[in-house]
């Protein structure tokens, strides 16, 4: 019987017969010596070829294939036995599972056996992904079968699709991508936090002398920001006493120290405190003076009468017009000294 050649089929030809077509058409014609219109299935000695050699031997046309077909003659393993010899030089074919019955629309036409190729020698072989389906006809359909031999079979060989490995490889690549994204996200968060710390560090001023800390990034300390009020009080044209004058000069000098400690462009509330302990003692006297000024401001007229005593216990009253004072500035001073207490 002639063999088909690679150029014996038209371009784009794909050979993919069903189980029924393999048995009822191809194998039945083979055992009855009928001629094929196009010979696409070759005769192969299964005991002399390895599965990976069948790809080139059983190739049909130029179209890529993932399964290969051939006719094979079943040889008995032992002359007096019924077992079939399916050993090759590199390994052997081992049957697995039960044979499947192939039927057409009305009757049974043959059987299909599934075999797996193992490398090495039985019973210790290494399983591979090569699978073979072996089709055989029923004895009633093979009237010319010789009782001394088992006859012809048609086989389909292919490689098992190992979906488990594909899924594992895909999941491992996805896991590595997620880990890479997670590391990149962590790096971005660290850079953002670092830039935030560098950005806010100039506004966190800590006093070196005491325990007070000014942190402008806290909203609950927003009340500490006051307009610059450390200036010398306006003169009212009289002296309360020599002690009050000294206290006034001391407070004015301390106010200048506050102004010098401030950086240009910053409010008083954002500066470092450099006043000494003596200033804390003078706060009470300043509050007393503010109360006195507030009491005199409560008069309805625009002038202020101030009474004082001289050294001879002679009291006199001085009425002197007071220039208009910014009420908001005085209120701010009062609130500040009240808050400092």
Swiss-Prot record:
Tissue: Expressed throughout the root cap, in both columella (COL) and lateral root cap (LRC) cells, with higher levels in the COL-adjoining LRC than the upper LRC. Also present at low levels expression in the tips of cotyledons and the cotyledon vasculature, as weel as in vasculature of the first pair of true leaves and at the hydathodes.
Source organism per UniProt: Arabidopsis thaliana (Mouse-ear cress)
Entry-linked PROSITE patterns: NAC
UniProt KW Nucleus keyword: yes
Superkingdom classification of source: Eukaryota
Assigned keywords, A-Z: Activator, Developmental protein, DNA-binding, Nucleus, Transcription, Transcription regulation
Pfam families: NAM
Cellular localization per UniProt: Nucleus
Matches recorded under Gene3D superfamilies: NAC domain
Gene: BRN2
GO molecular function: DNA binding; DNA-binding transcription factor activity
Comment on protein domains: The NAC domain includes a DNA-binding domain and a dimerization domain.
Domain NAC residues, every copy: 9-160
Full protein name: Protein BEARSKIN2
GO cellular component: nucleus
Main location: nucleus
């Amino acid at each position: 019987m002639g063999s088909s050649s690679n150029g014996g089929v038209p371009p784009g030809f794909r050979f993919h017969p069903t189980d029924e077509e393999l048995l009822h058409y191809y194998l039945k014609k083979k055992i009855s010596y009928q001629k094929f219109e196009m010979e696409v299935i070759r005769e192969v000695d299964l005991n002399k070829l390895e599965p990976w050699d069948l790809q080139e031997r059983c190739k049909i046309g130029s179209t890529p294939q993932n399964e290969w077909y051939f006719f094979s003659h079943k040889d008995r393993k032992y002359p007096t036995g019924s077992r079939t010899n399916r050993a090759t030089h590199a390994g052997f074919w081992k049957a697995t599972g039960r044979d499947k019955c192939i039927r057409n629309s009305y009757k049974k036409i043959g059987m299909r056996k599934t075999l797996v190729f193992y490398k090495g020698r039985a019973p210790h072989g290494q399983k591979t992904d090569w699978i073979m389906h072996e089709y055989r006809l029923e004895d009633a359909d093979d009237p010319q079968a010789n009782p001394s031999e088992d006859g012809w079979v048609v086989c389909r060989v292919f490689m098992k699709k190992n979906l488990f490995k594909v899924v594992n490889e895909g999941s491992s690549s996805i896991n590595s991508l997620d880990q890479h994204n997670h590391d990149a996200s962590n790096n971005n968060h660290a850079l953002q936090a670092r830039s935030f710390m560098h950005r806010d560090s100039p506004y966190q001023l800590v006093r070196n002398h005491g325990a007070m800390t000014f942190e402008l990034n806290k909203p609950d300390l927003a009340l500490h920001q006051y307009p610059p009020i450390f200036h010398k009080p306006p003169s009212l044209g009289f002296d309360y006493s020599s002690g009050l004058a000294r206290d006034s000069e001391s407070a004015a000098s301390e106010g200048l120290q506050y102004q010098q400690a401030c950086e240009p462009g910053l409010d008083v509330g954002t500066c470092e405190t450099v006043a000494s302990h003596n200033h804390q003692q003078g706060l009470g006297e300043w509050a007393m003076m503010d109360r006195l000024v507030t009491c005199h401001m409560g008069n309805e007229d625009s002038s202020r009468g101030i009474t004082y005593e001289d050294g001879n216990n002679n009291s006199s009253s001085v009425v002197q017009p007071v220039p208009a004072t910014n009420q908001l500035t005085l209120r701010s001073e009062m609130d500040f000294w009240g808050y400092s207490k």
